[in-house]
A protein has these predicted regions:
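Carbohydrate-binding surfaces of carbohydrate-active enzymes
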Residues: 1-174
């Protein structure tokens, strides 16, 4: 136990804590999936996430019942008095997934008290005449201007902005 605790403390304090200090000095926001789902890593995930300005988890679009750490990120935010609980969102969303399916995932994350999404997307789309364009080395990053529903997706994004804004106004509940 002592060795594991020492390693967890070093990762939390000397790595994530040091990065947060450097970001503070530079005036840079710092969000991190601090140790995340690194199950083989000797760490205290709540402690590590508590050392960063914005604790972050992630949820994937293809594993709707996956082992996500979004509740861990929101718990760290609550325990350590942080207003933002962040999540990498919609990782590996496919072109065949509808906005309704993605909204269900968003609602799942909001229920876990996540109030900031960092959308996993491929904004790099250099070609104007090739579809689906660059999808990120075989990954299914469909959340970009080349998706056929993109021009109709504004209400989807507005909904998420409203939910995140509303959640940041309140206080977490148990």
């Amino acid at each position: 136990y002592d060795l594991r605790r020492t390693v967890a403390d070093v990762i939390s304090d000397n790595y994530f804590g040091t990065l947060q200090t450097l970001c503070n000095k530079a005036g840079v926001d710092f969000t991190a999936q601090a140790t995340g789902n690194g199950l083989s890593l000797v760490a205290d995930n709540l402690q590590a996430k508590g050392r960063v300005q914005k604790p972050q988890g992630e949820f994937w679009a293809k594993h709707i019942h996956g082992s996500y750490d979004i509740k861990e990120a929101s718990s760290a935010a609550h325990i350590y008095g942080k207003r933002i609980a962040s999540a990498e969102a919609y990782t590996d969303a496919k072109f065949s997934q509808s906005l309704a399916e993605l909204k269900n995932l968003a609602d799942f994350a909001y229920a876990a008290q996540v109030n900031e999404f960092v959308v996993c997307a491929s904004a790099y789309q250099p070609w104007l005449d090739k579809y689906p364009g660059s999808t990120g080395g075989g990954r299914h990053y469909c959340l970009n201007r080349n998706n056929t529903y993109w021009e109709y997706s504004r209400p989807f994004w507005d909904y998420q902005a409203r939910c995140a804004g509303l959640m940041r106004k309140g206080m977490p509940v148990d």
